[in-house]
Curated annotation (Swiss-Prot):
This is ATP-dependent zinc metalloprotease FtsH 1. Homohexamer. It comes from the Bacteria. The keyword Nucleus does not apply. Keywords: ATP-binding, Cell membrane, Hydrolase, Membrane, Metal-binding, Metalloprotease, Nucleotide-binding, Protease, Transmembrane, Transmembrane helix, Zinc. Its EC number is 3.4.24.-. It comes from Alkaliphilus metalliredigens (strain QYMF). Residues 30-103 are extracellular. Binds 1 zinc ion per subunit.
């Protein structure tokens, strides 16, 4: 039996509708629309009087029709008078009343046409729904980058030894599941890597997949944040479906906080798209077994804002911190990034590592890349310490501005004293810190100058060190006031004031370093509302004033050193560590 496709069936139906409509029109024309003799109303009355009319059809229209005694049809004007019907009946004429003599045919034709339109509309609607469904499925299909047989290994990652050991254990889980099943141990379903940006979270996840010899499916948390309802959850389901089809693999979700934030919205609950997406992720992670060889890894810079359900056992079982590298790790990272570069043998990587406190692995890579660019510009034989030194200040403060013709002499003087104040305050208050460079050359990052203050590696910040950091931040503005007067202080201290306020606010609100507030955390008690607390505002203001006055007394006593540094800056524009130390040595010997 011949079977028609849906498209062919619709075409046949359309042709049938047209044919039926044509037949209906033909019938209508043939039987109901014969030629009628059109006569005047006067002639109609005369024929009525003469008894020549057999039948008259009365309707509501402007015309009336009828049949003569000889069978011929006629049509004439309808006078619409009340006495017309009575007059016709008195003359023995048969009267038929109808609303429309052709209504049956017209109704049939109308029904057929409407039916045809409805059929076409249904077809188009279904076709559109199918197309919409396909588009939805297409949008629900998450795109991910894959990696197999990558050259990245744990040996290519320097620092974070503890994190690497954790990752190596997961590799062993994937390669030797029997070893752990013997003891009833289950492979963690999920691992969250957290830490500062640029510390190598993605690199570690890639290395894990590479070492285990499994596929690496990488997506971003923002890929699941969509305008259309249900798309995020659909993408989660599709991702896990594809992962299961591939067998053993590593799913890596970067910036998971985009979909995994805490769902507590001030007690109001939540049912928006991000909640549905998170629920889909939680469901999928609960729905597969560790024996399937799928590990879900995620990265975030903010572990504290993730939903508790995401961090419970059975979901992301392990949380591994990827911290900023310490001195040895920085040296190892620098060694790694200089392996295939022509480095001058005189370059001391340990010295660079000591200088790059709080640099992440990515920042160290950028440092060496900038140094290589400077060497390439000069077409030098080697990347020298000078190139690395220049790259260091470019990474930290931006490149030096070439055109400085628009800088007024008074602006240079204000900048020189401002930066000299920072340098002297650092040497006096934080002797353990290194002042490696002071300059009054503007940078492309908007700084009029800067004083490079490098602290030592340390695990904690003491109250004393935080107080001294505030004083150093305030010292530039204080010197402006001492030298130029209170009415001539400038906007150059805006970043310094911001930094000092942040440190002092944290001491009072978070770290319990204020006797009046005591050992409480304002953020826990009041949330963001605590930031506007009047009491905190007053305490911050009073303590800032006290520290400002103490620093002012110190700098007034050391004004001769500040002037010496400032005068040298006005001449040389840039002072390095040995030059600054020489100025201080000269005053200490006096």
């Amino acid at each position: 039996m011949l079977k028609l496709t849906k498209k062919q069936l619709i075409i046949v139906l359309g042709i049938a509708i047209v044919v039926v409509s044509a037949i209906g029109y033909a019938v209508y024309t043939q039987y109901f629309n014969e030629d009628k003799l059109e006569i005047s109303y006067t002639a109609f009355l005369e024929s009525t009087e003469a008894g020549e009319i057999r039948t008259v059809n009365l309707s509501e229209g402007p015309k009336l029709t009828g049949v003569f005694e000889d069978g011929k049809q006629f049509i004439t004007d309808h006078p619409r008078t009340d006495s017309l019907k009575e007059n016709l009946l008195l003359h023995g004429i048969q009267v038929r009343e109808t609303t429309d003599q052709y209504s049956v045919v017209q109704v049939i034709t109308f029904v057929v046409l409407i039916g045809g339109f409805i059929g076409v509309a249904i077809f188009l609607s279904k076709k559109n729904a199918t197309q919409t469904s396909k588009e939805y499925d297409k949008m629900s299909d998450v795109e991910f980058s894959t990696q197999k047989d990558s050259s990245i290994r744990f040996a290519d990652i320097a620092g974070n030894q503890e994190a690497k050991e954790n990752a190596m254990e997961l590799v062993d889980f994937l390669k030797n599941p029997e070893k752990y099943s013997r003891y009833g141990a289950k492979m963690p379903k999920g691992v969250i890597l957290y830490g500062s940006p640029g510390t190598g979270k993605t690199l570690l996840a890639r290395a894990l997949a590479s070492e285990a010899g499994v596929e690496f499916l990488a997506v971003s948390g923002s890929d699941f944040v969509q305008v259309y309802a249900g798309l995020g959850a659909g993408r989660i389901r599709n991702l896990f479906k594809k992962a299961k089809d591939k067998g053993k693999c590593v799913i890596f979700i970067d910036e998971i906080d985009a979909i995994g934030k805490k769902r507590d919205r001030g007690g109001l609950g939540g049912s928006d798209e991000s909640d549905r997406t998170l629920n889909a992720l939680l469901t999928e992670m609960s729905g597969f077994k560790g024996s399937e060889g799928i590990i879900v890894m995620a990265a975030t810079n903010r572990l504290d804002i993730l939903d508790d359900a995401l961090l419970r056992p059975g979901r992301f079982d392990r949380q591994i911190e990827i911290g900023l590298p310490d001195l040895k790790a920085r040296q190892d990272i620098l060694q790694l990034y200089t392996q295939n570069r022509p480095i001058d043998p005189k370059v001391c990587l340990r010295g660079i590592a000591q200088q790059t406190v709080y640099f992440s692995g990515a920042k160290l890579e950028n440092l060496m890349n900038e140094a290589a660019i400077y060497a390439a510009r000069e077409e030098a034989d080697f990347i020298t310490e000078g190139h690395i030194d220049k790259a260091f200040y470019t990474v930290v403060a931006g490149e030096e501005k070439k055109d400085r013709s628009n800088i007024q002499p008074i602006d240079r003087k204000i900048t020189a004293y401002h930066e000299a104040g920072h340098a002297v305050a650092t040497k006096l208050l934080c002797p353990q810190n290194k002042v490696t460079k002071v300059t009054i050359i503007p940078s492309t990052k908007g700084a009029g100058g800067f004083s490079m203050n490098i602290p030592p590696d340390q695990m904690y910040h003491t109250k004393n060190s935080m107080v001294n950091s505030i004083k150093v931040a305030l010292s530039g503005r204080i010197i402006e006031e001492i030298v130029f007067g209170p009415d001539f202080v400038t906007t150059g201290a805006s970043n310094d004031i911001q930094k000092a306020t942040e440190i002092l606010g944290a001491m009072i609100k978070q770290f319990g370093m204020n006797d009046e507030v005591g050992m409480i955390n304002y953020d826990v008690l009041f949330g963001r509302q605590g930031a506007c607390d009047q009491r905190v505002m007053e305490l911050t203001k009073l303590n800032m004033k006290r520290l400002y006055d103490e620093t002012k007394v110190l700098l007034e006593k050391s004004l001769n050193i500040v002037e010496a540094v400032a005068e040298d800056l006005l001449i040389k524009e840039t002072l390095k560590e040995d030059e600054i130390n020489e100025i201080f040595s000269g005053f200490q010997s006096m």
